[in-house]
C-alpha cells in the first residue's frame, strides 16, 4: 500500500483549502441568490428525503456544501481546518478527499435512514388519526409532532375535524420535505 509522506506539515493543505473555498463560495452564492431571487438556495440544494417530490439525486453531494447561517459555516470550516489539515497531512490529499466524500455520503445515508424511521412512525400515527378522527387524537398528534413555525399560524384556523385532517396531511408533507444542510457528518 502506498503511503503518503509529506515533506513538511502544511497548515493549510490543498484539499482542505479548496473545500474551505468551495464552502465559502457556496455560502456567498446562496446569500446572493436569496437577495436576487428572493428564494432560498437550500430549497434546491439541501438534502430531501427520497420520497419527497423535491428530492433530486444531486442533493446527495450538494447538501455537504450548504450551511444554514454564518455560525454554522464558521464552526464547520473551523473543524474542517483543525482536523482535516492533520488528516490530509498524514493520509495525503487523495485519501483525505475520498474520506471526506464518503463521510458526507454516509451522513446522507444516516439522515435518510433516520428520516425514514421517523416518517414511518409519523405515518402510523397519522393513519391512526385518520381512521379515528376526533379532537383528542388531533391534540395527541400535535403534541407528538409539533408543527414547525410556517404551519403554526395555519393551526389557529383549524376549527373542525375536516380542517384537522387537512392540517395533518400538510404537516406530514412539511416533515417529509424538510432538508438537511451542512455536511451531515462529513466533518464530525
Short names for language-model regions:
Residues 1-188:
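A detector for small-residue-rich transmembrane helices and their helix-helix packing motifs
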